[in-house]
Amino acid sequence: MHFHFSKMHGLGNDFMVVDCITQNVYFSQELIRRLADRHTGVGFDQLLVVEAPYDPETDFHYRIFNADGSEVEQCGNGARCFARFVRMKGLTNKYSISVSTKKGKMILDVEEDDQITVNMGVPEFEPNKIPFRAKQKEKTYIMRVGEKTLFCGAVSMGNPHVVTVVDDVDSAEVETLGPLLESHERFPERVNAGFMQVVNREQIRLRVYERGAGETQACGSGACGAVAVGILQGLLDENVTVSLPGGDLHIHWQGPGKPLYMTGPATHVFDGQLSC
């Protein structure tokens, strides 16, 4: 099997992007793991696959695979790279691109300054739709994680997120608490774990331990989830800058029942071809 690919990143959250419309490529879980290896493969946090639309009302279908080969529902940084890729490769000349995902639909708007705004949909706080095991919906949940008791928010941005507020994100126990939260029994489909430091009502600092990938330089849906939880808990205003290790994202959300918008860059690194 021979195919072409692009290496891209959104604030350091890096991707291998493959056009599966003009190429016939099949990715097994084993192959994805081999390609994701940073020593012996291409190296990436996620594989993004561009497919022909499943829904006639959309332009493309967008699939996301983590480095461990598991398929996931959403990736915000990947969505921005997806938008740049399909235009760069001549698959569309639209500036507003509609895509379907495993969990729903998204609109990707390419701005004149090469920033890309993604309509991430309406944040979902109902526990059974995240999914999260809880008796009822709350703004804050008490969770026992290892030897610690954490106060967390839970939300779905198309994929599940748990968010805990910390005093200093640099000293947050991401390496130890991240894996424990990711596989916590209250999240039956595992979860992305965000550690949020509130700088002021318009800025947060954030680190994210991603389900199936570990800590990444940036997580778009994690930034969205953190802001949604922060606004719900009364900590943040509707326009927030999220400072991640890889750079800044801008999030706008007017509150429950409204769609959330994420704006940020998408960077093309190189093109390549592989025979597997």
Curated annotation (Swiss-Prot):
Protein residues bound to substrate: 13, 46, 66, 76-77, 159, 192, 210-211, 220-221
Main subcellular location: cytoplasm
Residues with site note (Important for dimerization): 270
Superkingdom: Bacteria
GO term, biological process aspect, one: lysine biosynthetic process via diaminopimelate
Pfam families registered for this protein in UniProt: DAP_epimerase
GO MF annotation list: diaminopimelate epimerase activity
Residues the record marks as active site: 75, 219
The reaction(s) this protein catalyses: (2S,6S)-2,6-diaminopimelate = meso-2,6-diaminopimelate
GO-annotated cellular components: cytosol
Pathway the protein contributes to: Amino-acid biosynthesis; L-lysine biosynthesis via DAP pathway; DL-2,6-diaminopimelate from LL-2,6-diaminopimelate: step 1/1
UniProt keyword Zinc-finger, yes or no: no
Subcellular location as annotated: Cytoplasm
Gene3D superfamilies from the UniProt entry: Diaminopimelate Epimerase, Chain A, domain 1
Record's keyword terms, sorted: Amino-acid biosynthesis, Cytoplasm, Isomerase, Lysine biosynthesis
Site location (Could be important to modulate the pK values of the two catalytic cysteine residues): 161, 210
Recorded family membership: Belongs to the diaminopimelate epimerase family.
Assembly description: Homodimer.
NCBIfam families according to UniProt: DapF
Function as written in the Swiss-Prot or TrEMBL entry: Catalyzes the stereoinversion of LL-2,6-diaminopimelate (L,L-DAP) to meso-diaminopimelate (meso-DAP), a precursor of L-lysine and an essential component of the bacterial peptidoglycan.
Record's protein name: Diaminopimelate epimerase
Organism of derivation: Vibrio vulnificus (strain YJ016)
